[in-house]
Amino acid sequence: MNIDLQAREITPLRNTYDHVARHIGGDKVASRYQEATYGAQPMVNFHYRPTWDPGHELFDASRSKIVLADWYVLKDPRQFYYATWTMTRAKQQDAMEANFQFVEQRGMVGKMPDGVREKALTVLMPLRHAAWGANMNNASICAYGYGTAFTAPAMFHAMDNLGVAQYLTRLGLVLGEPQSLEDGKQAWLDAPEWQGLRRLVEDSFVVSDPFELFVAQNFALDGLLYPLIYGGFVDDHV
């Protein structure tokens, strides 16, 4: 019995979806990021207005004072959509696991000076709660924002901040056992030096404009906190 295999070229009828083509200037080959992002925002045929906010549709651009002529003019330079984001974070998770394993297997925590360990715990453990606040705020931006190019990265960043909180938790368990987490919580609640940051984080929970919250959390707060803590403190003083 002979089997004759022949290659045949199949020409696609179109290169991408119509709703994507409208944003990239015609029927061109679109990237995965473009197909996962452009035109994905629900705009019509909602079943009902939310009972807790009858003044708005489920997805409503009027929740923000900032209104864009094109909601997809915002673009992620990393081209993250769900698949590329998860693959990138998985590789970073593997690297972090290797770092923790390297430290734990060699007993390097026990070789740290007590002063350095205490300083790290005193400064970093309360920041678990700031990272949790950033997670909440970016989840809110995703829930109430408009335009997938704006809301999808906010959800990725929400989960990134949850990861930061988890890494700080693990660091606390490695350096100081469970009591260090409780000490960090009490410092966040009661220590005078943390109350300004805590007030800012908690006040941001009631900001209803997604763009205002985006600027407050991701530009102002993170823009000051990350260089101060993970640059100035961790790199220069620990």
PLM regions: where:
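Terminal targeting/low-complexity segments that flank the catalytic cores of oxidoreductases
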Residues: M1-A130
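Long, hydrophobic, well-ordered secondary-structure blocks that form the structural core
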Residues: D114-G115, L121-G196
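His/Met- and acidic-residue-enriched segments that coordinate or traffic transition-metal cofactors
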Residues: F80-Y81, A139, Q166, P227
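Acidic/His metal-coordination segments adjacent to aromatic residues that form catalytic metal sites
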Residues: F102-V123, G184-F219
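Alpha-helical bundle segments that constitute or directly flank the non-heme di-iron/ferroxidase center
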Residues: V44, Y48, D114-G145, S208-D236
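Short helix/strand-bridging catalytic loops that position acidic/His residues to coordinate divalent metals
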Residues: F156, D236-V238
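Charged/polar, solvent-exposed surface patches and flexible loops
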Residues: A83, M87-A90, D94, A98, ...
